């Protein structure tokens, strides 16, 4: 059963492993459910970019931005534990995202009881 639940993930959720994927998922939901809300996103890849982005945020230069930071350039799909080339991982992930039957989660999420 856990396997089938895994495959039912939304397209937005499936894209989390790629740099920019978390922010993109949030932006898609906001655009769908709150179209009048403007979304400003700043994302950083790699520790140096993350540090720079956090410094800018601390200085007040990114006020109102949704900030996403991925420690590995390219995101988790390009991390130290990966065993396939990054371009193949991106291509495979894009296909996995596209094949989701649900692009984004419903506006009203149902409660899930954990055992």
Locations of regions flagged by a protein language model:
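Iron-sulfur-associated redox domains of electron-transfer enzymes in respiratory
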Residues: 1-115
């Amino acid at each position: 059963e856990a396997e089938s639940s895994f495959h039912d993930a939304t397209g937005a959720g499936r894209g989390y492993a790629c740099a920019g994927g978390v922010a993109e998922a949030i932006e898609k939901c906001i655009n769908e459910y709150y179209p009048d809300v403007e979304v400003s996103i700043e994302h950083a890849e790699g520790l140096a970019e993350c540090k720079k982005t956090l410094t800018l945020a601390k200085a007040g230069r990114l006020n109102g931005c949704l900030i996403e930071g991925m420690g590995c350039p390219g995101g988790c799909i390009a991390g130290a534990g990966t065993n396939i080339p990054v371009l193949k991982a991106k291509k495979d992930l894009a296909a996995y995202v596209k094949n989701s039957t649900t692009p984004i989660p419903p506006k009203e999420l149902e409660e899930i009881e954990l055992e």
